[in-house]
Amino acid sequence: MPTIFIVYNLKRETNAEEYEHYLAKTKIPAMRESWFIKDFKTWKIDKVLAPVVSESEGKLPTEPPYHYVAKIEVVDLNAMVGFLGTEGGKQFLKSWSVYIDPTTIFTLGHEM
């Protein structure tokens, strides 16, 4: 099953509480109601925890490079891409784009 991971930050001027309200009331319900999405979850990253390698080079950053991670399990990727090309899909992305930094990255992967 295709899985999309999105790592992102909010725009500097975005109020985190306002964004979390948007997530809870608009984005999460809309994503979970879409027939082409099996599951959708978002995590807020709290802090840098530890190095991944036993002997890291240099000092760990004090702030995570991204503060949010979303995971979308997609039943039909073509249907999702098709929806995003519609007026409704464009409006949905536009409503999210108000909050997120333009360095947002979408990645596509699969379970191993």
Task: Enumerate the language-model features and the residues they cover.
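Macromolecular interaction modules
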Residues: 1-112
